[in-house]
UniProtKB/Swiss-Prot annotation:
SUPFAM superfamilies: PRTase-like. Transmembrane segments: none annotated. This is Bifunctional protein PyrR. Signal peptide: none annotated. GO terms for biological process: regulation of DNA-templated transcription. It comes from the Bacteria. It catalyses: UMP + diphosphate = 5-phospho-alpha-D-ribose 1-diphosphate + uracil. Regulates the transcription of the pyrimidine nucleotide (pyr) operon in response to exogenous pyrimidines. Also displays a weak uracil phosphoribosyltransferase activity which is not physiologically significant. Its EC number is 2.4.2.9. The gene is pyrR.
Amino acid sequence: MADGTVILDTAGVKRALTRIAHEILERNKGVDGLVLVGIRTGGVHLAREIVARLEEIEGATVPVGEVDITLYRDDFKGHAPHLPVGKTDIPFSLETKRVVLVDDVLFTGRTIRAAMDAIMDHGRPACIQLAVLVDRGHRELPIRADFVGRNVPTSLKEKIAVLFDAANRPTDVVLEK
């Protein structure tokens, strides 16, 4: 485990993800037309966990995809021509779908902006909603999460780490000073 203070243990993470799943269902009145897209890599694992809960609650399949934002990041443009590009896998149409974009930690908003650009290059959804396990504040862009597991105000020097087990299930959220 990383050094720091555990702010969500395994049980707390499970409760937060279950609550997020229920909030998604309430906001969207079920799963019809709903898809989840996780941001590589932590967001992908969390999206799969949320989809499992949605499917358990609703008894219906919910498509899940993943998006890599490497080519959309604004902090690397022109600076790193040989960035390793991960896989974007969205094996379904986004046209007119309600997309829930999932990430582990919301900080400046720049990752989310990049992910929205990538999603729009794959189609025009009816709407994009944002689900995050942790919102730590310090936004640089006008972006907010629709579904939040835990708000954790931090200093700029602190970091939030979401830890995963060998099966890519979230185990803890740690505040590192």
